[in-house]
A protein has these predicted regions:
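Aromatic- and acid-rich polysaccharide-binding/catalytic face
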Residues: 171-172, 242-266, 280-282
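Short, hydrophobic beta-strand segments
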Residues: 1-9
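Aromatic-lined carbohydrate-binding surfaces of glycoside hydrolases
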Residues: 6-7, 16-23, 31-235, 244-253
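Short, glycine/acidic-rich beta->alpha junctions
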Residues: 11, 74-75, 125-129, 224, ...
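Catalytic-core region of carbohydrate-active enzymes that cleave or remodel glycosidic bonds
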Residues: 258-316
Length: 316
């Protein structure tokens, strides 16, 4: 069992909590007492960036509501409130359906905050949903925006799923079947990114945004990664671009300006020792041995030690 207690203005002191466990027949099968100490202090504003990927499609699927509907935005609002409450201040923002953790050739439910129209080969964009999303982040105290990845995972060869109304027909125009370095997507990014960044600046949130190309470029697809990065970078001048990167040699070559390093990377000591403007760290499902994580089967000290490590190594 995991039990959270809300102080709700209680005076500092020690409060006994008694927990009883009953079976389906209402027979008591266990009992424990816990003395909860409330100290006379509040945590200050978080001094680091903290993000967990926030998937709006999962909210829609789990609750059975139409994505981008009023009901969906109401739920997103509630989830954002909890997200912020747990100390998260940077949120994945799906300008297009995030191409994350998706089997090659398959799709996630469409979660696209930017409306795309193509008429006689010319693109135009609607940003009302994106503005509504950003307003909810402001309402809930989420300061920073992590713009969804511009290319697919595991090779960066393809485009994210993008839906558009083309000469009156609503359909998918990019996805696993379109090349990330192809002329069609180049043309699209050249039209889209200037419009997006202009809106972010007009709304006063540009300085709080981070952009992604794709995760973990490796030796095998490094040329493709660099080509795609160079497609986007001219339109993102002044914005910070960050990606998961665990090969220190690639950082030395300037492949990624703001690398996010796996906590079990063999090159982590090199990253920690480097003179970097920001030091980022991540863990996901593969960090199972020797490092911190928050798997439910782990003892809680393996989770809590992360705070000490972030402080010790001055992680951003």
């Amino acid at each position: 069992y995991w039990i959270s207690v809300e102080p709700e203005g209680k005076i500092a002191g020690t409060y006994p909590i008694e927990i009883r466990i009953f079976d389906d027949q209402k027979n008591q099968v266990g009992q424990v007492r816990y003395d909860l100490e409330i100290i006379d202090a509040e945590l200050p504003k978080l001094s680091i960036y903290n993000t967990n990927w926030f998937h709006g499609d999962c909210i829609g699927t789990h609750h059975g509501v139409k994505i981008l509907s009023d009901a969906w935005f109401d739920l997103v609002d509630e989830y954002m409130a909890v997200y912020a409450k747990f100390g998260l201040n940077l949120i994945l923002t799906p300008v297009f359906t995030p191409p994350l953790d998706t089997n090659i050739g398959e799709e996630r439910p469409t979660t696209q905050l930017v409306e795309v129209t193509c008429t006689n080969g010319q693109y135009s964009f609607g940003f009302d949903y994106l503005k509504r999303w950003i307003e909810l982040t402001r309402k809930n105290g989420i300061e920073f925006l992590e713009i969804s990845h511009l290319f697919t995972q595991w090779g960066a060869k393809h485009c994210p799923k993008i839906m558009a109304t083309v000469d009156g027909e609503y359909k998918r125009i990019f996805g696993w079947d379109t090349e990330g370095t192809g002329e069609a997507y180049r043309t699209f990014l050249a039209a889209f990114l200037p419009k997006l960044t202009a809106k972010l600046k007009a709304w006063g949130v540009a300085e709080y945004c981070r952009f992604h190309v794709t995760d973990e470029p490796s030796e095998n697809f490094l040329p493709c990664y660099l080509q795609e990065k160079n497609q986007a970078a001219p339109y993102l001048e002044g914005f910070k671009m960050m990606d998961a990167l665990s090969e220190f040699a690639f950082y030395e070559q300037g492949v990624v300006e703001y690398p996010v390093v796996a906590s079990n990377s063999r090159d982590l000591p090199k990253f920690l020792a480097a003179d970097m403007p920001e030091k980022w760290l991540y863990y996901c499902c593969s960090q199972t041995k020797d490092v911190s994580n928050r798997f439910i089967a782990m003892p809680s000290n393996r989770t809590r030690i992360l705070g000490v490590q972030l402080y010790r190594y001055d992680i951003s």
